[in-house]
Amino acid sequence: MYTYKIGISSEAHDQFVLAQPQADLLQSSNWGKVKDNWEHERIGFYEDGIQVAAAACLIRKLPLGFTIIYIPRGPIMDYANFELLDFVVKTLKTFGKSKRALFVKIDPSLVIKQTLGGKKSEENEFTPSIITFLKELGVEWSGRTKELEDTIQPRVQANIYAKDFDFDSLPKKAKQSIRTATNKGVNITIGGTELLDDFSTLMKKTEDRKGIILRGKSYYQKLLNTYASHSYITCLLYTSDAAD
């Protein structure tokens, strides 16, 4: 039997989320502290008393008492369990109505296609069936969008995992670019708040050059403070005394 609880503790929420394959920073309880211009709520879902799903919700108040609800990179659950998925979606609809939400936007990490280690890209065989079932439950899918503005979180990601990285497997041009940068005095520096001023200055220059709007220094400071032991700034620093 499935049940749910609104307002679970941050400890219980994080303990469950961190143990799941879909664990994501945006579903951590601390993300509500970063997005402090939204209200937030945590919902736990249970099967016979054992937690099987979680949703960290961001709630934006609108005029006339309405709201919108956003669950970034969540809910966290086993999407292959359609019975559980049905219960979670119905619960979120009920929760949305209680908050007078115009809509509840979910944003789970469901991989459609991936390429690992430079191999041929492979389609995930099960994801389409999950999407079909979500549609049957009344969920609207944004589709395989291509423009950045079409989604809140990036739909396409390029991840290189440390355990899989091999310099020799990089394309020849990439390896040459790295060697050239190193020889010219470009070094990778990883740090924290001591790099914040330099990093913020670079972001501002990027804004001016590209004609876009990025986050400001205070936002990066908030991330470093909120995730003190898990957040870092990576900068490429140039020193002119290296070999020409």
Language model segments and positions:
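Conserved aromatic-histidine-acidic binding/catalytic patches
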Residues: 80, 122, 191
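Conserved donor-binding loop and adjoining core beta-sheet/short helix segment
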Residues: 33-119, 240
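Acyl-donor-binding surface of acyltransferase catalytic domains
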Residues: 85-187
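Positively charged, low-complexity/disordered segments
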Residues: 242-244
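A conserved beta-strand-loop-helix scaffold within acyl/acetyltransferase catalytic domains
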Residues: 6-48, 54-64, 139-150, 159-161, ...
